[in-house]
Amino acid sequence: MSAKKLFIQTLGCAMNVRDSEHMIAELTQKENYALTEDIKEADLILINTCSVREKPVHKLFSEVGGFEKVKKEGAKIGVCGCTASHLGNEIFKRAPYVDFVLGARNISKITQAIKTPKFMGVDIDYDESEFAFADFRNSIYKSYINISIGCDKHCTYCIVPHTRGDEISIPFNIIYKEAQKAVEKGAKEIFLLGQNVNNYGKRFRNEHKKMDFSDLLEELSTIEDLERIRFTSPHPLHMDDKFLEVFANNPKVCKSMHMPLQSGSSEILKAMKRGYTKEWYLNRALKLRELCPNVSISTDIIVAFPGESEKDFEETMDVLEKVRFEQIFSFKYSKRPLTKAATMPNQIDEETASRRLSTLQNRHSEILDEIVKKQENKTFKVLFEELRAGNSIAGRTDNNFLVQVEGSEELLGQFKEVKITNAKRMVLYGEIV
């Protein structure tokens, strides 16, 4: 019997990418589906959604409306992920042609969902931490691995605890076996995923070996033929000295750290319920620079959070100047349902929010120009992962710079030393040496 066709669109973060891989694995290996990039020939159309900001939620309904217009007769549409979790039955009301809704904490139910009319699985307390998913990966050379699900932080602006539930760690033996299996199949790099990865080990479903995130990194680095370990996202509150020292000293841990700042104002951080101050954040970031001079630090910043004054915004700019981030993901505050910040007084007007975002981004562009210029004539070890137009190939350095050289398919999955000849903001161009 010929395979049915599956089309999947993934919005949002790396955790959504891994969730999509899990659903693809379940459907291709258990339900006789094969992936297609042509939505018109698909028997099943999935969209895996994000709800961190308002814009992706609006995008969901425009996308599924488009799916309905082009899908073939009898094809099913499923809405999955975080927006599915928080909108639930509202999706059926607004888009009655959707066949099932599957929340971010319920993706193991995908084979049940496709067989049940108007199936809705949105239980954020459902525990998938020990579910044995079938195996599928978009990349041979890099493997995403979940180490926890959910989040306990309840930051006042964030909807994630309402869509992914409380935090629970995945047992070490499951993580280790998954990493080992990925390496045996050709992975050179593993990418550990969780809302707060460095809070790992605080709570498991059952009794398991006591282990924190630093211990996990050390244990995984013993896997033979594993070259690199990356992770996202750590929480600044849990960046103790042990963690920073393991990060700096373990040669398999990539020297790229995502440190979500959100705001440089201690008052705004308190209102956000982030659990740390500006001083704590700077202490950790600057200690990291001291321990690991070649580290690249990226961050998330929200401008115009309710009550943010010009002085508060200047505190954020001050952290930008002191840390000099290699990369920032910056946004205007987006009011999200179910969050405390949505009903806070002193919401900031659009004009002020746009001005602050432009000021932040423009200054960071200047800093980034200075940073990338210093990379010229340096030599980096690069893992090549992606073919590009014009007989070019791209990969990443240990500290996460994107590098492009002339090259072809045989370089995929290989490490090569590359000398940088021309450094741009988004790409470092170089030559293999």
UniProtKB/Swiss-Prot annotation:
Its cofactor is [4Fe-4S] cluster. The keyword Kinase does not apply. It catalyses: N(6)-dimethylallyladenosine(37) in tRNA + (sulfur carrier)-SH + AH2 + 2 S-adenosyl-L-methionine = 2-methylsulfanyl-N(6)-dimethylallyladenosine(37) in tRNA + (sulfur carrier)-H + 5'-deoxyadenosine + L-methionine + A + S-adenosyl-L-homocysteine + 2 H(+). Its EC number is 2.8.4.3. Residues 4-119 form the MTTase N-terminal domain. Its main location: cytoplasm. SMART domains: Elp3. Residues 137-370 form the Radical SAM core domain. Coiled coil: none annotated. InterPro entries: Elp3/MiaA/NifB-like_rSAM, Methylthiotransferase, Methylthiotransferase_CS, Methylthiotransferase_N, Methylthiotransferase_N_sf, MiaB_methiolase, rSAM, rSAM_horseshoe. It holds the Pfam family Radical_SAM. The keyword Metal-binding applies. [4Fe-4S] cluster 2 binds at residues 151, 155, 158. Binds 2 [4Fe-4S] clusters. One cluster is coordinated with 3 cysteines and an exchangeable S-adenosyl-L-methionine. It is found in: Cytoplasm. One of its GO terms (cellular component) is cytosol. Residues 373-433 form the TRAM domain. It comes from the Bacteria. It is an enzyme of class 2 (transferase). One of its GO terms (molecular function) is 4 iron, 4 sulfur cluster binding. Catalyzes the methylthiolation of N6-(dimethylallyl)adenosine (i(6)A), leading to the formation of 2-methylthio-N6-(dimethylallyl)adenosine (ms(2)i(6)A) at position 37 in tRNAs that read codons beginning with uridine. Belongs to the methylthiotransferase family. MiaB subfamily. Monomer. HAMAP family: tRNA_metthiotr_MiaB. This is tRNA-2-methylthio-N(6)-dimethylallyladenosine synthase. It comes from Campylobacter jejuni (strain RM1221).
